[in-house]
Amino acid sequence: MFGLAAAPEVDDSLAAAAAADLSLEVSNEIPDFIQKGDREGADQIAAEDARIPRLVLAQAQTPQAMRGDPVYIDGLAAGMAFNDLTNVVYGEAPLEVIVVRADKPRWVEFGDDRSVIDPSVPPGDLRTQFTTDPETKKRIPPKATMFYDYVVLLGPQMEPLALSFKGSAIKLSARPLNGLIKMKPVPIYACKYRFTPRFMKNDEGTWYVFNVAQIGVLKNQETFQKAKEQFNIFKLKDVSFDVEHPDTDAPEDGSGI
């Protein structure tokens, strides 16, 4: 009989050293020796075959913020914003964005198991309406969840991100943002806004929303032109927005509608 060979010992110090060396070899910044805009090798990937990342405000039940979850992002905690594609954590600090697209509200119907039953519930459908319990006379939230969707440009790099609001964030974030957008007699992409994570609490639990404030109208012509270019790119583009069940983000009490 042959015995099993002993498993080779792993030198953790070597793995750590390799990781340290790798961190010195890569960067999110494009070095001077690489030509910006050169898409060599990626020509076959059409715009419709790629999705832009989403700007997400982590909640207690967000998988990326839960230690032990396979998709956990190191350092991410509830109340922090992050990029769901690159896993970059933006943190708790206020974010400066330019809005280049604001869609009409849409509705999604979810099942009891949080699966999507109908991703495109028509406006005016009975599932989008509040009802009243005949016995308790209490208002019952619609069966379908309302979403407000945007495309924003984040920070000095003007990084395009998809952004969706649902639940209480509609009343606390989306509608204030829409009001600010309508206030100025300028194109939607001509203003900059500040999104600040805000802690919320009620009988259903705790969660975070973005507090929205307008910084002002863009003064730099180059920034304005870049924002206009992104507006033209995304105004008709099919963007993959959030279709997550509201329980993964915040307590859903119907107060957002």
Regions found by a protein language model. Give the residues of each.
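OB-fold ssDNA-binding interfaces and closely related basic DNA-contact patches used
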Residues: 1-157, 202-209, 214-218, 256-257
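Generic detector of well-ordered alpha-helical segments enriched in charged/polar residues
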Residues: 31, 171-178, 224-232
